[in-house]
Each structure stands twice: as C-alpha cells, then as structure tokens.
Regions:
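Short alpha-helical transmembrane segments in multi-pass integral membrane proteins
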Residues: 1-22, 80-145, 189-245, 301-368, ...
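Transmembrane helix-bundle signature of multi-pass secondary active exporters and lipid flippases
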Residues: 25-78, 142-149, 238-304, 324-332, ...
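Helix-loop interface residues and adjacent transmembrane-helix termini in multi-pass membrane transporters
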Residues: 34-37, 46-49, 83-86, 161-162, ...
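Alpha-helical transmembrane segments of multipass membrane proteins
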Residues: 37-40, 112, 154-158, 177-185, ...
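Membrane-helix interface/capping residues of multi-pass secondary transporters
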Residues: 40, 49-52, 89, 118, ...
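Small-residue-rich hydrophobic transmembrane alpha-helices
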Residues: 52-112, 149-168, 275-339, 372-386, ...
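Hydrophobic transmembrane alpha-helices of multi-pass small-molecule transporters
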Residues: 64-67, 179-183, 208-213, 285-288, ...
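Short runs within selected transmembrane alpha-helices of multi-pass transporters and secretion channels
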Residues: 73, 142-160, 168-176, 197-210, ...
Length: 449
C-alpha cells in the first residue's frame, strides 16, 4: 500500500498537488497526440496532400472507438477514485477486474466490425472515392491494434484514479518517440505510405501497454490482483456501465459532431480538407491541457467526495478554474504568434492555400480558447461529484450548436474557412449557458463547500 499512499489527495495542500498531478497528465496526453500529429506531419511532407486528407478524414472514425474506450475507462476511474478515497480496497479490486474484462470484450468486437465495414463507413461521411483506399487501409490497421489502446487507457486511468499521473507518462514518452521513429522508417525509408504510418502507431501503442502492465505487476501491490483479475462482479457492472457509458456517450457525441462537420468540410475540396486536418491537430494540442486540468479536478473531487471533505472539494474546484485561466492566456499568446510556423509543419512548400487557410483559422480561434477552458473546468466538477449526465447533456448542447453553426455558415452562407472558429465559439457559449445554472444550483445544494 505504501507505493501509492503518497498519491492520496484527501489531505495536505491543494494547489501544489493539483498542479503536480496535472502536469504529467498534460504531458502524457500531449505525447499521445504526437502519434497522430507525427502521422500528419510525415505523411503530409513525404506522401502528399491527398494522403494527408486520407489520414485526417479517417481520424474522427478512429476517435469514436478510442473515445468510447477512454470514456468507459474515465467513468470507471471516477468510481475507483471514490472507492480509493473511502479506503474500500475490496470493492476497488473487483471494480478494476470487472472494467478490464468488459473493456477487452468490447475492443475485440469493435475491431472486427471496423475491419469489415471500413469502406461503407468512409462513404457514409462522404469521403471522396480517390481517398477511400488509403483511408480504409489506415483505419483497418489502426483497429487491429485497438486492444492495445484499451489496455493502456485502462491501466493508466486506474493509476490516475489512485492519484499517480507520473508513471503512465514515462511509458507514453517512450512509446511516442518510438512512434515517430516508426513513422520515419515505414513511411520515409520503406515508402509504405499511410499504411506504414498506421503500423508505427499500433506497434508503439502495443509497447506502451506492455511496459505499463509490467510496471504494475512489479511495483504496485494494490493492483497485483492475481486470480482476482478474472473476477467479474455483475453487481458492480451495472454502475460501471452507467458511469462508463455516460462518459463514453459524451465522447461519442463529441466525435459524431466532428464527423458531421467533417462531412461538410469534405464537400469543399482537398485543400480545405487538408487545412481542416492540420488545424484540428493544432486544436487537439491546445485543448488537451484544458481537458487534463479538468480530469485532474475530477480525480481530486472524487477522492475527497469519498472521504467526505466538502470544503476541500470547493477549494479544489476554485483552484482548478484558476489554472485553466492562466493556461488559456498563455495559449493565446503562443498560437497567435506562431500560427505561420505551425501551419508550415503540416504542408509542403507548394501547398500555399492550405497554409493560408490554416493561419486565418488559428488567428481567429486563439482568442476564444478561454471558453473551452471554462467548460472543461465545470465538466471536471460534475464528473468529480458523479453527475456524469450533466457532462453528457452539455457536450450534446455544444456539438448541436456547433453543427448548426457550421451548416449555416459554410453550406448556406458560403462563408470562408475561418468561420469554423466562430462555429466553435457558438457551441462553447451554448454549452456554458446550459452548465452554469446547474453549477450554481449544485453549489447551493451543498455538493461541495
């Protein structure tokens, strides 16, 4: 038990533990994003515009499966954090084994479905026929390694639920560098195109999963369940599915909205598709720390809810919002100032239109980043207290507002590419209008403080 007691967030200072928990979480997810970013940069530079469009247009489909998995793990981790905060280790061990078995089964089924249905799904979102062969090859290879994605997310979320965000980072950093090396080898040296990029991603994720499992077996006694890994507790499954499915539905709702937006973008030509792929990668890097600050708040609040420390929950929430604000201001300065340099990473020298479109978008979106910072902080609060339905409904409101805005601006009014940033802002405002009254009500009802 001594291996993880130091990660107990129910006592001591608030700011320093919250920041020290958040930083490895942010770094870990940024390194994870380098998987797809490396695909985009290397494929765009060494294979071409159409290959970059193929990778980008398949990414939202891939993300639906990945975010279903991470959503289930995230929902289960809220329960784990509360059980750990309450020192209920027997229930915690059964929670861990039940989540693992259910997640593995889901991953296998989803992988088989996508191996069979890759082409029809791509046509459903209006991917041009010329891009389908490369996009389908990329998808099939990625889905063959979906079990690795689940196992790493499961093991990492379990450690984070106990307050340990540093250990998953160490494995992920190694895996990220291997992925970049693999991209260079398979794409640049062997010239395997988008298929080589997908192979590099799967291999790196498999290694990350393996290293994480070995470490847990040797270093974290609480998670060495032995035969208990095969315990499937039906009584816990219901609550796990409730929390996990709500969180997963939230993630899928977000990606379905992105798919609809992608289907609109796909009608605007290959250059616009490539620019959209590039700015989405930048947005992913920008949003990830905001999301991770919210996840750190979730772990902090859930552990303290299990321990019954309501005043500490309130202070943790306020501290988390302050961190979100400081980060968003710094983000604006970086994206605004470096937009041209950022876009040249994703396009060949001759793709001036792609670079120009991306710069106009980034200059506009950069000053709006404070809004997702606020929404992620509020969502961290509701996840931490166990009210995941609010996070689901608010995400739906966000994507509904964004999709409507995209259709009006792009399809009806024929506005320029940068108007996608205004659509994002509209979605965030709708989301906050839904969340803030519920937050005030929850505070008044004594959920914390």
């Amino acid at each position: 038990m001594s291996t993880i007691e130091k990660h107990d967030m129910t006592q001591g200072k608030i700011l320093l533990p919250l920041v020290s928990f958040t930083i490895p979480l942010v770094l870990g997810n940024l390194f994870q994003l380098t998987y797809n970013a490396a695909d985009s940069v290397i494929v765009g530079k060494y294979v071409g515009e159409q290959a970059l469009a193929a990778v980008g247009t398949s990414t939202p489909i891939m993300n639906i499966a990945i975010l279903l998995i991470s959503g289930m793990c995230m929902g289960a981790s809220v329960l784990m954090s509360s059980q750990y905060g309450a020192k209920d280790y027997d229930t915690l061990s059964r929670q861990i084994s039940t989540t693992m078995l259910a997640g593995c089964g889901f991953s296998v089924v989803f992988s088989l479905l996508m191996l069979l249905l890759a082409n029809p799904v791509l046509r459903l979102i209006r991917v041009p026929e010329t891009a389908i062969p490369e996009a389908a090859a990329y998808l099939r290879i990625i889905f063959m390694g979906l079990i690795f994605t689940f196992m790493y997310n499961f093991l990492a979320n379990t450690m984070r639920a106990l307050g340990d965000s540093k250990t998953p980072l160490y494995f992920l950093v190694t895996s990220a560098f291997l992925n970049i090396f693999g991209d260079l080898f398979f794409v640049v040296v062997l010239r395997w195109g988008v298929a080589g990029s997908a192979i590099a991603t799967v291999c790196s994720e498999g290694l990350c999963c393996l290293l994480c499992g070995i470490y847990i077996k040797k270093k974290i006694p609480l998670l060495c369940l032995g035969k208990k890994w095969w315990v499937f507790d039906k009584s816990l499954l219901g609550k796990t599915v409730s929390y996990g499915s709500t969180s997963a539905m939230q993630q899928v709702c977000l990606q379905l909205g992105k798919l609809i937006i992608q289907s609109v973008v796909n009608t605007q030509g290959v250059a616009v598709m490539a620019a959209f792929t590039a700015v989405n990668r930048v947005d992913d890097f920008a949003y990830t720390p905001q999301q991770n600050i919210g996840h750190a708040m979730t772990t902090f609040l859930a552990q303290n809810k299990g321990a019954g420390h309501k005043e500490r929950m309130k202070k943790g929430f306020q501290t988390g919002l302050l961190i979100e604000l400081v980060y968003s201001i710094g983000l604006f300065c970086v994206i605004w100032g470096l937009a041209p340099q950022i876009m040249t990473l994703f396009a060949e020298d001759g793709d001036a239109q792609v670079v120009s479109l991306g710069i106009s978008y980034l200059h506009l979106i950069s000053w709006m980043y404070i809004l997702p910072g606020l929404t992620n902080g509020v969502q961290g609060f509701f996840r931490g207290i166990g009210d995941l339905k609010v996070t689901l409904y608010s995400t739906f409101m966000n994507m509904f507002g964004r999709v409507v805005a995209v259709f009006v601006m792009i399809r009806l009014l024929q506005m320029e590419f940068a108007s996608l940033a205004w659509a994002n802002m509209f979605g965030w405002i709708v989301m906050l209008l839904f969340e803030v009254p519920l937050l005030v009500k929850s505070m008044r009802n004594g959920e914390c403080g």
